Amino acid sequence: MIMVNLRIINFIGDIMKIRGICYRCGAEDELIDGLCPICYAQEHPLIEVPDRVEIEVCHMCGSYKRKIWQTPKSEEAFEILNEIAYYATKDAIKKKSVMVEVEIYPEVTQLPGGKRSKLIIPVHIVARGRLPGEKEDRTYEKDIEVHLRMVQCPRCSRFMSNYYEATLQVRAMNRYLTEEEREELDNFVREELAKRLKKDRMAFIAKFIPQKEGLDYQLGSVGAARNVAQRIKEKYGGKITETATLVGVDRDSGKELYRVTVSVRVPEYKVGDVVEYKDKYYLVTAITEDKVYMKSIDYKREKIGLAWHIAEKETKMAKKKDELDTATVIATTPTIMVMDDKSYEVYEFDNIGDVKIKEGDKVKIFKKEGVSYLVNKIEGKDKQ
């Protein structure tokens, strides 16, 4: 398609070329629209661009407005200004032919001073190529000025006015978050929002509200709240719920405006904990985004998987992993016998195929209402 277009351009150019006297300088040469090549080049630059270009730049975050507000690719001040001047110039240039290539050279020498400051960036432009009817490429150079108009972008304006579209609630099922979980989850939320900001300029925290139950974040973007909640669920497991509250009507469109609350509840328990489900006790063996996987600690060693909406309602914590008693194996045949490491009581269990142990191994045991259960063998980093 491009080759066809170039042939058409060259054909039109050949028609335009007639040898004669240039009406501008009087030289005899091949004429293009009545002008010799030199005069034609002077009358017809390769590009059109104004001497002064203006662009809006946010004095708070450094974003700049093209068709929409753009976040700079760099974090270094001079590189940001180079980027702004480059795109301001590029958007203002109108090429006169597809055979023209343009190079843009911003010349940043100073930094802006603040909200009401003015900054002018000189820019040198080099265009190379030719117009229809010209035999050879030529070069056209021009110096312009890019004027930065310091304003406050919509995002920062909303941020400064505590604007928010959604509340992200981080909770735990059937209990409060521990201090350790609060710190870990808060760091995770902030890291995920920092990543999200590169795609969603409204993914800022308008307000952080610690609650006794967990953590609340008022966010500038509903999408950010949903995205971070999903990332928490992917990493820790759990359940997400969403509600919306009518807060008003848009003046321009008449559409109803809602604030959304996205609640993510991480599991009550972790891998290695013992939980109760339908009057039986289970060892938590795996936690995924959608389910919790467990194994009964009786002689059957039944394996099951529960969706989180079921697990939240029908299971409860029986004993945390770190709170289980430990014991030492003193015999393995015909039954397994262990001695409690604290009370020195001896307990006897049936030999269970999926628990491969030998004398001297450390195991965890669970005691409830006079009944003892062999939970699992202590291995790896769990060894004391």
Curated annotation (Swiss-Prot):
<dbReference type="GO" id="GO:0005737">
    <property type="term" value="C:cytoplasm"/>
</dbReference>
<dbReference type="Pfam" id="PF04981">
    <property type="entry name" value="NMD3"/>
</dbReference>
<dbReference type="InterPro" id="IPR039768">
    <property type="entry name" value="Nmd3"/>
</dbReference>
<protein>
    <recommendedName>
        <fullName>Uncharacterized protein MJ1650</fullName>
    </recommendedName>
</protein>
<dbReference type="GO" id="GO:0043023">
    <property type="term" value="F:ribosomal large subunit binding"/>
</dbReference>
<dbReference type="InterPro" id="IPR007064">
    <property type="entry name" value="Nmd3_N"/>
</dbReference>
